[in-house]
UniProtKB/Swiss-Prot annotation:
One of its GO terms (biological process) is translation. It comes from Lachnoclostridium phytofermentans (strain ATCC 700394 / DSM 18823 / ISDg). The gene is rpsT. This is Small ribosomal subunit protein bS20. The lineage of its organism: Bacteria, Bacillati, Bacillota, Clostridia, Lachnospirales. It comes from the Bacteria. Binds directly to 16S ribosomal RNA.
Length: 87
């Protein structure tokens, strides 16, 4: 445990941010799974709707600093590619 007051404060802040990041990442993972399930079922309509929700969540996470900008772009690109592969 830290002895310095500022270090103790940083520990509290880090715990708060870690919790927030976990919640956001969990939500993104859930939305990504919805897209992947729809793609696996070849359901174009559901996949497209799910993709929109997932993209919004991923972009918000990137703007909050949960994901790096390029990591978010890569996730969105891969999901879009999967949805577009449905004939």
């Amino acid at each position: 445990m830290a002895n310095i007051k500022s270090a103790k404060k940083r520990i509290k802040v880090i715990e708060t941010k870690t919790l927030r990041n976990k919640v956001i990442k969990s939500k993104v993972k859930t939305l990504v799974k919805k897209v992947e399930v729809a793609v696996a079922a070849s359901d174009k309509d559901l996949a497209t709707k799910s993709l929109k929700d997932a993209v919004v969540a991923i972009d918000k996470a990137a703007s909050k600093g949960v994901y790096h900008k390029k990591n978010a772009a890569r996730k969105v690109g891969r999901l879009a590619k999967a949805v577009n592969s449905i004939a």
